[in-house]
């Protein structure tokens, strides 16, 4: 029979050699001997013979232990030889032989190894018994050598992560995960239940994951945040621990604001999953020093709605001579409630209390406090009055159901002035989203560019931080099926939305916009004429020098067979050819 194939999983590197198993078997003998005192020799022989008759028992680690018991009970060697040889099917050796054959037929050794390992992994996952694993682990009394060897290999670490996810109460697996973490592989432990079983492991994974998010920056936040938030929101204990740690880090001058942003995104994730974490949020902030304000805030956050009674409590506190810290009301979930109350079409708000709502939102958005040694030394309210007026003006325009599109056009200059305030821009963006998402909105429009979409251009121009939300809304509208419109009307609408994306690109939000159009081209679910339209519009507004990232994204769109050669040149001016030539001569293009 062929020996082990190079690189296959059956070698001694994974499971040790026979002498090691023998020593372990001898070491475990005393326990069995003690428990087996007085056993009838015939019973022992019968038990051992039953084991010898099972398939491939000669390959089992306990073979030496069983042989010793059998011979001590007076067993016959002939029976052993006959049973072991008759039941030897050589599964492991056959795998190695097949692996050798595959390699000899030209298959890469690495590919053969992956095939064997993946099949073995699937079998282990299917047949794993946590009780047996725990019993074997308990009998060992120390960390088995084979386990330490296994965790040195990526394949088997991945197996342990999957098993730990499926069997969170298995002691052997939890211990193994800690071993993996101790060995410095905590960056791999992204599985929720695996990371959350032990505080020491969770702390390491939390630290590594948070560092990855902070180092990745805004552009990688969408990719890195969901797994992190899912892990933190695994349970109340993990949420409290993580938020408490981030609350402390958020106080640091360097990088503190970025950590606070991550903490707020996790709060939003918890809220979207239906968890009420408002009390933890308030307890970790400054609210604990203001129990009445804390009670009012907590009540509104828990209900997910503002109410006049609690708003009045906060209004009195924030119009007093010594108001609470503005940080108290700068809770994203709380500010979102103001968006719904003040900017959602058709929202009803008690007119007697409206000024209180507006004042608190304006206060949260505009007041600047100066602190030294944990003492507030000044409160800057220079922009409070103008912010309040802008919010009130736009609220009256947005929530007035009697104002149609034509009336809004007459108020555009006023809206543009008010949009310069960031909080108003956010409110207008929400209002536009709610309005244009109405099924019949575009059916009733006669203008080429509806006024609501024109407002998005102004928001893009004034507020760089709102670019992601603007693109998100445009993408949602672009991908929506407007079945109430005919085919030509749908194409015209999508061209209008592409115009907004091109404007967004011209305001500096380049890579996300081009990346989205590139995905549309690759998915083959967008009319190719729309891609050509986008390319033409972009070529009209760009000029060298270009960044390498932009070229790597945009050039493949132009070189696509459906695009190249289909965009008409204007006289002698051929922007597509000129752009491609410029890129070829100035960049090394990676396919």
Curated annotation (Swiss-Prot):
<keyword id="KW-0805">Transcription regulation</keyword>
<feature type="compositionally biased region" description="Acidic residues">
    <location>
        <begin position="34"/>
        <end position="44"/>
    </location>
</feature>
<keyword id="KW-0539">Nucleus</keyword>
<dbReference type="Pfam" id="PF04858">
    <property type="entry name" value="TH1"/>
</dbReference>
<protein>
    <recommendedName>
        <fullName>Negative elongation factor D</fullName>
    </recommendedName>
</protein>
<feature type="region of interest" description="Disordered">
    <location>
        <begin position="1"/>
        <end position="44"/>
    </location>
</feature>
<comment type="function">
    <text>Essential component of the NELF complex, a complex that negatively regulates the elongation of transcription by RNA polymerase II. The NELF complex, which acts via an association with the DSIF complex and causes transcriptional pausing, is counteracted by the P-TEFb kinase complex.</text>
</comment>
<keyword id="KW-0804">Transcription</keyword>
<dbReference type="InterPro" id="IPR006942">
    <property type="entry name" value="TH1"/>
</dbReference>
<dbReference type="GO" id="GO:0003723">
    <property type="term" value="F:RNA binding"/>
</dbReference>
<dbReference type="GO" id="GO:0032021">
    <property type="term" value="C:NELF complex"/>
</dbReference>
<keyword id="KW-0694">RNA-binding</keyword>
<dbReference type="GO" id="GO:0034244">
    <property type="term" value="P:negative regulation of transcription elongation by RNA polymerase II"/>
</dbReference>
<comment type="similarity">
    <text>Belongs to the NELF-D family.</text>
</comment>
<comment type="subunit">
    <text>The NELF complex is composed of NELFA, NELFB, NELFCD and NELFE; NELFA and NELFCD form a stable subcomplex that binds primarily through NELFCD to the N-terminus of NELFB. Binds RNA which may help to stabilize the NELF complex on nucleic acid. In vitro, the NELFA:NELFCD subcomplex binds to ssDNA and ssRNA in a sequence- and structure-dependent manner. Interacts with ARAF1. Interacts with PCF11. Interacts with NELFB. Interacts with KAT8.</text>
</comment>
<keyword id="KW-0678">Repressor</keyword>
């Amino acid at each position: 029979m062929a020996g082990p194939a190079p690189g296959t999983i059956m070698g001694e590197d994974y499971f040790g050699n026979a002498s090691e198993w023998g020593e372990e078997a001898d070491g475990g003998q005393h326990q069995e001997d003690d428990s087996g005192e007085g056993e009838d020799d015939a019973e022992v022989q019968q038990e051992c013979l039953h084991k010898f008759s099972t398939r491939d028992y000669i390959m089992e680690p306990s073979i030496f232990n069983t042989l010793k018991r059998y011979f001590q009970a007076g067993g016959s060697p002939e029976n052993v030889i006959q049973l072991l040889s008759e039941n030897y099917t050589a599964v492991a050796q056959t795998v190695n032989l097949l692996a050798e054959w595959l390699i000899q037929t030209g298959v890469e050794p690495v590919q053969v190894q992956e095939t064997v390992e993946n099949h073995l992994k699937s079998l282990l996952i299917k047949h794993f018994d946590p009780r047996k694993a725990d019993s074997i682990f308990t009998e060992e009394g120390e960390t088995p050598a084979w386990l330490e060897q296994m965790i040195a290999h990526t394949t088997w670490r991945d197996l342990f992560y999957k098993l730990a996810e499926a069997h969170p109460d298995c002691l052997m697996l939890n211990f193994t995960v800690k071993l993996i973490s101790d060995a410095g592989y905590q960056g791999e432990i992204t599985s929720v239940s695996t990371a959350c079983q032990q505080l020491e492991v969770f702390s390491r994974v939390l630290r590594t994951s948070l560092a990855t998010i902070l180092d990745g920056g805004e552009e990688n936040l969408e990719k890195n945040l969901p797994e992190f938030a899912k892990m933190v929101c695994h349970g109340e204990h993990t949420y409290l621990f993580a938020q408490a740690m981030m609350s402390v880090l958020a106080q640091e001058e360097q990088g503190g604001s970025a950590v606070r942003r991550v903490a707020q995104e996790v709060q939003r994730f918890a809220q979207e999953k239906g968890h009420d974490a408002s009390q933890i949020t308030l307890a970790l902030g400054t609210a604990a020093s203001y129990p009445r304000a804390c009670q009012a805030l907590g009540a509104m956050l828990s209900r997910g709605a503002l109410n006049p009674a609690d708003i009045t409590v906060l209004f009195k506190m924030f119009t007093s001579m010594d108001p609470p810290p503005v940080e108290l009301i700068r809770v994203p979930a709380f500010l979102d409630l103001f968006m719904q109350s003040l900017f959602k079409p058709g929202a009803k708000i008690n007119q007697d209390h409206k000024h209180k709502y507006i004042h608190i939102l304006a206060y949260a958005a505009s007041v600047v406090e100066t602190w030294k040694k944990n003492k507030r030394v000044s409160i800057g309210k220079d922009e409070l009055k103008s912010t309040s007026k802008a919010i009130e003006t736009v609220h009256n325009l947005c929530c007035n159901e009697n104002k149609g599109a034509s009336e809004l056009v007459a108020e555009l200059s006023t809206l543009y002035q008010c949009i310069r305030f960031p909080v108003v821009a956010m409110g207008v963006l929400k209002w536009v989203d709610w309005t244009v998402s109405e099924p019949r909105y575009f059916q009733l429009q006669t203008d080429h560019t509806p006024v609501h979409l024109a407002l998005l251009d102004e928001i893009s121009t004034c507020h760089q931080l709102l670019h992601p939300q603007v693109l998100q809304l445009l993408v949602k509208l672009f991908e929506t099926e407007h079945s109430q419109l005919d085919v030509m009307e749908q194409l015209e609408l999508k061209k209008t939305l592409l115009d907004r994306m091109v404007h967004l690109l011209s305001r500096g939000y380049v890579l996300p916009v081009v990346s989205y159009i590139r995905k549309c081209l690759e998915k083959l679910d967008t009319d190719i004429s729309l891609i050509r339209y986008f390319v033409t519009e972009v070529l009209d507004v760009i000029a060298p020098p270009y960044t390498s990232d932009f070229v790597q994204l945009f050039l493949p769109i132009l070189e696509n067979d459906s695009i190249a050669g289909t965009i008409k040149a204007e006289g002698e001016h051929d922007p597509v050819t000129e752009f491609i030539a410029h890129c070829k001569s100035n960049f090394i293009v990676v396919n």
